[in-house]
Amino acid sequence: MRPLASALLMMLAFAPLGCKHRQAQSQSAFEKGAPELASTVHLGDPKVADQLVSGFHEIEANAWRWTARQFVVVLRAPAGSGQIGAGLQVHLTVPPVVIEKLGAVTLSASIGDGTLAPETWSKPGDYVYRRDVPASLIRSGSVRLEFQLDKAIPAGSVDQRELGIVVSSIGLALK
């Protein structure tokens, strides 16, 4: 009985060391590299917050975010898009308050030194801003998309935040 008790005691004594070692390895592996970028971000998902560079407000209704007049997102370039290009889709809503306060609003986008055609909406509603992204604008594994509205509701007039449009998702896919 004595050898069994000694063996159990030894196992219990060294068990925490093994656990700490595995935990330290997983922490350092996570710290070494950023999580993989998504090619489509759903703005109701808090896990994509690191890809929303600027101009996005907090999640609302677990599904969407208001934007400011200018907003920036980084997306993973789909495999092969550097050769054949990609399609951009922004699922958005132009709320009635935006049309009431500002009239028609125009959204434009750019990637590096390239611009994508703007689109204007004069009625409230749900829309999809779709654009082809030429392969020449996809130069690496990630794509920084900069969006700009021609106008936004200034902070303090309706809300404490500058309000542009409501976005539920932004994504790149192969053409």
What is the role of each PLM region?
Residues 20, 107-111, 126-131, 169:
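Catalytic cores of nucleotide-enabled group-transfer and carboxylate-activating enzymes in metabolic
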